[in-house]
Swiss-Prot record:
Cofactor annotation: Mg(2+)
Native organism: Prosthecochloris aestuarii (strain DSM 271 / SK 413)
Role played: Catalyzes the ATP- as well as the pyrophosphate-dependent phosphorylation of a specific serine residue in HPr, a phosphocarrier protein of the phosphoenolpyruvate-dependent sugar phosphotransferase system (PTS). HprK/P also catalyzes the pyrophosphate-producing, inorganic phosphate-dependent dephosphorylation (phosphorolysis) of seryl-phosphorylated HPr (P-Ser-HPr).
Stretches for region Important for the catalytic mechanism of both phosphorylation and dephosphorylation: 216-225
Protein name: HPr kinase/phosphorylase
NCBIfam families: hpr-ser (TIGR00679)
High-level lineage: Bacteria, Pseudomonadati, Chlorobiota, Chlorobiia, Chlorobiales
Length: 340
C-alpha cells in the first residue's frame, strides 16, 4: 500500500481565524487595540518578523507578509523619536499590506500611531508575554497550521505509549482490532479517517477527523461512541506516528517475514516509518501481536535490543564454539533430568 502521497498545505489564513484560534491552542492571550476588518488581512508564512530596520527606513527585502512583532526595542525606538519622525517611521511600516502587528510585554503605541494603523486597515494586538515567548508560541501554532497534511484510511491507537497506525484493505477488521485494543486499556486516537500532519523534518502527528472524532463504525453493530462507553481514559486527541501495521489477507504463496531481521519501512509525507505486515488468518490473535509490536518498538528504541539479532548471535556462538560439541556434557535444568 502506497502511503507516500503528496501532502496538502494551507496557503494562508485570515487574521480573524488566527485571533480566534490562537488562544484555544496555546497558553497565550491577544487583546485587540483597534477595530478593523480582520477577514481582509491574511497570513501567508509561518515565520514571524521584528521590523526594526523597516522602522528605520530600510525596507529592501522587507518580509511584510509575516506577522510583525513590536517588542521593547521597537517601541522604545519609536518613543524616542520626535512626533513627525515617529509618524514617518511608522508610515514606512504600515504602507505595506501587513497581516497584523503584535505588541509584546504590554507595550503601547501612541494614539496617533494606532489611528494610522486603523486607517490603513492593519489589526493591532497586544500580549503580556515577552517577545521571546510570544515568538516561540506563535511559531509553534503557525507551524501546525502551515504544515503538510494528508488524510488516510485506517485506525490510530496509542498502545503502551507507542503510536500505532493500522492500515489495510476494507473489511479486514481494522476497526475491530482497534476496539479490542481499547477494551484492553489502550487509547483510540482516530478510526476510519486518520489525519496526519508533518511537523518539522521527521515528526508525524496523527489526529482524528473533526466530524468523526472518536466514533467508530463496526460492521454488524453500527456506530460506537468510544468515549461514552469506555470513558475519557480510552481516547486521546493526537499522537506521534511511530509504527505502521498493515493487515494483509492470508496468501499461502506469499513470503512473510519470519525472523524480523529485515526492517521494512514506509514513507508518509516523506518520512520513513517502521512497517509491520501481518497476514490475517483464522486463530491468529492480532490484538496481542500488535501489543508485542509496540513493546518490541520500545525495547529497540530505549535499549537497542532486537530479539531476532539476539537469537542470531546466540546461534553463531553455538556453531563456532567447538568445545561444547566435544565436552559431552548436557545441560541440567531439573534434578535428574538431562538434555543430551
Amino acid at each position: 500500500m502506497n502511503l507516500d502521497q503528496k501532502g496538502l498545505k494551507k496557503r494562508s489564513m485570515t487574521v480573524a481565524y488566527f485571533f480566534e484560534n490562537i488562544s484555544k491552542s496555546l497558553d497565550i492571550k491577544l487583546r485587540r487595540l483597534n477595530e478593523v476588518d480582520e477577514q481582509k488581512r491574511r497570513i501567508f508564512e509561518r515565520d514571524l518578523h521584528r521590523p526594526g530596520l523597516a522602522l528605520a527606513g530600510f525596507t529592501n527585502l522587507f518580509t511584510y507578509k509575516r506577522v510583525q512583532i513590536l517588542g521593547n526595542t521597537e517601541t522604545r525606538f519609536l518613543n524616542h523619536l520626535e512626533d513627525d519622525d515617529r509618524k514617518r517611521a511608522f508610515e514606512s511600516l504600515i504602507k505595506f499590506k501587513l497581516p497584523c502587528i503584535i505588541l509584546t510585554s504590554n507595550n503601547k503605541l501612541e494614539p496617533e500611531l494606532l489611528d494610522m494603523a486603523t486607517r490603513a486597515g492593519v489589526p493591532v494586538f497586544v500580549t503580556r508575554h515577552s517577545s521571546t515567548k510570544t515568538i516561540y508560541l506563535l511559531t509553534d501554532f503557525l507551524d501546525d497550521q502551515f504544515s503538510q497534511y494528508q488524510q488516510f484510511h485506517g485506525s490510530m491507537v496509542d498502545v503502551y505509549g507507542v503510536g500505532v497506525m493500522l492500515i489495510g484493505n476494507s473489511g479486514l477488521g481494522k476497526s475491530e482490532v482497534a476496539l479490542d485494543l481499547v477494551e484492553r486499556g489502550h487509547r483510540l486516537v482516530a478510526d476510519d479517517a486518520v489525519v496526519i500532519n508533518r511537523k518539522g523534518e521527521n515528526v508525524l502527528i496523527a489526529s482524528g477527523n473533526e466530524i468523526v472524532d472518536h466514533f467508530m463504525e463496526i460492521r454488524g453493530l453500527g456506530v460506537v461512541d468510544v468515549k461514552a462507553i469506555f470513558g475519557i481514559r480510552a481516547i486521546r486527541d493526537k499522537k506521534v506516528v511511530q509504527v505502521v501495521v498493515e493487515l494483509l489477507e492470508w496468501n499461502e504463496e506469499s513470503d512473510y517475514e519470519r525472523l524480523g531481521l529485515d526492517t521494512k519501512t514506509t514513507k508518509i509525507l516523506g518520512v520513513d516509518i517502521p512497517l509491520i505486515q501481518l497476514p490475517i488468518n483464522p486463530g491468529k490473535n492480532i490484538t496481542v501481536i500488535i501489543e508485542v509490536v509496540a513493546l518490541n518498538y520500545l525495547l529497540k528504541h530505549y535499549s537497542g535490543y532486537v530479539a531476532a539479532e539476539a537469537l542470531e548471535q546466540r546461534i553463531k556462538r553455538v556453531i563456532t564454539n567447538e568445545s561444547l560439541k566435544k565436552s559431552g556434557k548436557g545441560r541440567t535444568y531439573l534434578a535428574k533430568d538431562y538434555e543430551e
